[in-house]
């Protein structure tokens, strides 16, 4: 009986892990449909969103549009593209603000707001769930470097 109980718990635990993985949405980096930016590396995306760079590789200004704290899309984006958790990100920006070296990107409520801001400004860059991409924005290929 003990074996069956343990096996059942193991299967249940596996199902929970699989379910949470499947629930995570694919997050993509987006720019305005008219933006000349064609691709970025993961490091370039991280540098723009962490305040280490305010320019695209072409030299044009890059204006990052963030999503609000606590957003699952935001947490997924920063984990995948910068390797930082929500707590690490908060600590990062606290340090940057305290030393006077910058401010975090403007944050909007959701993917629809990100698209609205980006569609009107070809210098903007943001992130949304892949299923939210439409004709107003273009998903950028991001090289894993």
Language-model region placement:
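N-terminal secretory signal peptides that target proteins for export/translocation
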Residues: 1-6
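The feature marks either
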Residues: 13
